[in-house]
Amino acid sequence: MAYILPGSSLDADLYAITDDALSFNRSVIEVVKQLLDAGIRIIQYREKNKSSNSMLKDCITIKKLTEEANACFIVNDHVDIAVLCNADGVHLGQDDLPVDKVRELIGKEKIIGLSTHSPQQAQKAIEMGADYIGVGPLYPTKTKKDVCEPVTISYLDWVVSHIAIPFVAIGGIKQHNIQEVIQHGAKCCALVSEILSAPNIPLRIQELRQAILLAHT
């Protein structure tokens, strides 16, 4: 098992992110249940086309499910919803509220992750007190419309060599390239469409974990 935050609840090899639009008409709650049953222990709630009230209802339910499974629950962007549902943490983008200000709102016990796309952003994330960073997008991706150009494996190599805090590799990671990501030093990989769009989510997760094991041999 790979560690993102040793000794904390944020501890896993795969980091799953929700997206209703990619879930084959399965509800986000159904998807989360399948993820947890398949052994996923970090789930980020990222929904762009729902009302705040709908997102809060989802997150209250997901928090209960993840708590029962001893899994970590992260809310994307919405600090208010993260606080109201008592999520384990929040994940921020470069254009979201500053990490240090969010820390004042959610407290020292909660996890704050920050997406980064360059060495400068990674270093600033550390200075501002992020608990972990997202590293990517490593490959082309259509999951997010407002994503920057791929930072490529070279940025991952830089992070592995220079950054001491935990990080999550993300962006265009698939079954066919996850071994490359692991071999370049990533301990945790975030995936969206590769998991959510699979007809059989537990089977896809099993296949991904087999690929990760092969990367270590």
UniProtKB/Swiss-Prot annotation:
Cofactor requirements of the protein: Mg(2+)
Binding site for Mg(2+): 77, 96
Entry's Gene Ontology BP terms: thiamine biosynthetic process; thiamine diphosphate biosynthetic process
Pfam families: TMP-TENI
EC number: 2.5.1.3
GO cellular component: cytoplasm
Positions annotated to bind 2-[(2R,5Z)-2-carboxy-4-methylthiazol-5(2H)-ylidene]ethyl phosphate: 141-143, 172, 192-193
GO molecular function: magnesium ion binding; thiamine-phosphate diphosphorylase activity
Reaction catalysed by this enzyme: 2-[(2R,5Z)-2-carboxy-4-methylthiazol-5(2H)-ylidene]ethyl phosphate + 4-amino-2-methyl-5-(diphosphooxymethyl)pyrimidine + 2 H(+) = thiamine phosphate + CO2 + diphosphate; 2-(2-carboxy-4-methylthiazol-5-yl)ethyl phosphate + 4-amino-2-methyl-5-(diphosphooxymethyl)pyrimidine + 2 H(+) = thiamine phosphate + CO2 + diphosphate; 4-methyl-5-(2-phosphooxyethyl)-thiazole + 4-amino-2-methyl-5-(diphosphooxymethyl)pyrimidine + H(+) = thiamine phosphate + diphosphate
Domain of life: Bacteria
Keyword tags: Magnesium, Metal-binding, Thiamine biosynthesis, Transferase
Residues engaged in binding 4-amino-2-methyl-5-(diphosphooxymethyl)pyrimidine: 44-48, 76, 115, 144
Cofactor note: Binds 1 Mg(2+) ion per subunit.
InterPro entries on file: Aldolase_TIM, ThiamineP_synth_sf, ThiamineP_synth_TenI, TMP_synthase
Pathway as given in its UniProt record: Cofactor biosynthesis; thiamine diphosphate biosynthesis; thiamine phosphate from 4-amino-2-methyl-5-diphosphomethylpyrimidine and 4-methyl-5-(2-phosphoethyl)-thiazole: step 1/1
Assigned protein family: Belongs to the thiamine-phosphate synthase family.
Function, as annotated: Condenses 4-methyl-5-(beta-hydroxyethyl)thiazole monophosphate (THZ-P) and 2-methyl-4-amino-5-hydroxymethyl pyrimidine pyrophosphate (HMP-PP) to form thiamine monophosphate (TMP).
Protein name listed in UniProt: Thiamine-phosphate synthase
UniProt source species: Lawsonia intracellularis (strain PHE/MN1-00)
Gene: thiE
